[in-house]
């Protein structure tokens, strides 16, 4: 982590997002109804889904903090992928309803230009949601939290959708009343895409997809640079929520005693954790190198 208080931010960030989402839902909903902007009303429904998403994220973070037990010996970290998939599903469902309503409105031709105040409201929400995105993506990346990262992208999608609403409202006011409805369709397509991406990422995590090649190379290099390590014949890694888990099988000098081999393994574990802060579960299997290979 870049800063010591990144861990503290992890506990606070979702509450800030939850509060901001509630305020934005009410703000956009009321202003959308008063100004007659169907796109802004639809955007308020998107923010309403954000409120639910923030609540799900907060719950998943609490559960993922629980220590491993007999029922879940590998811990509760993967709950964050489930949380991320729920957020993605909410976005996808909301986008589908928004798309349907907007297309029906476009087909029927029942649209009219909203008040310019809708554009003012949309611009405020763009700023708020972009700030929340930047805050959450920083905390999520530093803590390696898929749930917080998913919530951050939820806010980014809200910021982009509000920007589309703002453009649509302005175009409607200056003489293109259909633009507000078209903006709503564009918003729904964007939100749906983000939802699908979050669901895809969650599936990869739950299916134990491999960590990035760069992380594997880092772990391999750190292990090989450890004194008395002769070679590595097996290495794999996966994400478990915020943590990274490695399985490493290495060979050491065949002349080492069992106690010394254990010390080498512990040195490898410590050095990898220093280099990769989120590598909290490292399984090491040590065996002696063949005598001929060791002499070579």
UniProtKB/Swiss-Prot annotation:
Membrane topology note:
Multi-pass membrane protein
Alphabetic keyword roster: Biomineralization, Ion transport, Iron, Iron transport, Magnetosome, Membrane, Metal-binding, Transmembrane, Transmembrane helix, Transport
Pfam families associated with the record: Cation_efflux (PF01545), ZT_dimer (PF16916)
Q: Name one GO molecular function term.
A: metal ion binding
Q: Name the segments for region: C-terminal domain (CTD).
A: 215-296
Q: Which GO terms describe its cellular component?
A: magnetosome membrane
Domain notes, please? The C-terminal domain (CTD) is probably responsible for hetero- and homodimerization. The CTD assumes a V-shaped, dimeric metallo-chaperone-like fold and binds 1 Fe cation per subunit.
Q: What is this protein called?
A: Magnetosome protein MamB
From what organism does this protein derive? Paramagnetospirillum magneticum (strain ATCC 700264 / AMB-1)
Q: Which gene encodes it?
A: mamB
């Amino acid at each position: 982590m870049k800063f010591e208080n990144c861990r503290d931010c992890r506990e606070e960030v979702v509450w800030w997002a939850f509060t901001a989402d509630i305020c934005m839902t009410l703000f956009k909903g009321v202003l959308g109804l008063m100004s007659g902007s169907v796109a802004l009303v639809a955007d308020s429904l998107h923010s309403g889904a954000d409120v639910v998403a923030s609540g799900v994220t907060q719950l998943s973070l609490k559960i993922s903090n629980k220590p491993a037990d007999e029922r879940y010996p590998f811990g509760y970290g993967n709950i964050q992928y489930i949380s991320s998939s729920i957020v993605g599903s909410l976005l996808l469902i909301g986008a589908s309803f928004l798309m349907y309503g907007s297309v029906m409105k476009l087909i029927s031709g029942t649209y009219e230009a909203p008040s310019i105040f809708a554009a003012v409201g949309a611009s405020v929400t763009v700023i708020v949601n972009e700030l929340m995105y930047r805050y959450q993506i920083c905390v999520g990346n530093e803590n390696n939290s898929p749930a917080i990262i998913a919530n951050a992208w939820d806010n980014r999608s809200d910021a982009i959708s509000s920007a589309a609403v703002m453009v649509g409202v302005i175009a409607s006011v200056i003489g293109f009343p259909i633009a507000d409805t078209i903006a709503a369709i564009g918003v729904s397509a964007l939100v749906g895409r983000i939802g699908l991406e979050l669901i895809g990422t969650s599936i990869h995590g739950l299916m134990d997809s491999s960590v990035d090649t760069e992380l594997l190379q880092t772990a391999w290099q750190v292990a090989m640079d450890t004194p008395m390590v002769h070679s590595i014949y097996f290495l794999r890694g996966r994400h478990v929520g915020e943590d990274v888990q490695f399985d490493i099988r290495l060979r050491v000098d065949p002349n080492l005693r069992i106690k010394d081999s254990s010390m080498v393994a512990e040195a490898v574990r410590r050095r990898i954790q220093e280099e990769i802060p989120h590598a909290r579960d490292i399984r090491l299997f040590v065996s002696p190198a063949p005598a001929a290979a060791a002499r070579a």
